[in-house]
Amino acid sequence: MIPKSSSALHRTAKFQIIGLAFFAQNLCGQILISRWDFNSGSLSPQAGLGEALLVGGTAATFAAGYEGEAAGGWNIRNFPAQGRLPGTAGVQFNLSTEGYSSVGLSFQIRHSNTSANSERVLWSVDGQQFTEATRFSITPASTGTGESWYQRSVDLPLAAANQANLSVRIVSDFDLGTEGQYLASRLGSSYSTSGTWRFDNVNFSAVPEPEEYAALSALALLGFGLWRRRRSGANRGTSATTETSAFR
């Protein structure tokens, strides 16, 4: 086997260094820390650690997901009666954000025609006292608002970072334009407790803290160093064999 030239080895090393730099640069941005896609028909996260559960007396089944998976969506029903218990019923996700800052949440949600048009996103660090992070509301229309999927993104408050027990709820709420009343997601429909919300692709992302970033970078550098040593040793052995053959 013809050994690689010194320039070829340098080019290989250069590409590896560029790749390492790209990896390190990516670590400066948000990375996925927990994900639920429900494709397995269970509430276990598909990435990272965490817990998904129902709150406020809701019930659930699995139904078609955002991309059409047969059981890829978490379908929620049994919401409060009209005019009662706003901001209490829906779903909750528990996870740790220790070692991370700039926590973000994204998810897809499908509103049935008779479901509440308004969602509140709440967060807590003790699972008891919840604070509103944001709210989303659909303006009902006769077509296109009910039985439709929506993409949601939330930047959680700074205090949600570096928490051992972060809880986030997505719950139904009264419509802001109708005093003390839920409003159906489709114009012409009436709000019903049997209306459903369906969740898919619930993702939590965050930025590693400097200590976490340093540890990941050190591991990457260590791996690169070991690779260089092994490549160097292999090339020395190949060169020696080739040179000996040349003198015969």
Regions found by a protein language model. Name each.
Residues 29-56:
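Extracellular carbohydrate-recognition regions
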Residues 35-38, 130, 134-206:
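Terminal, low-complexity interaction segments
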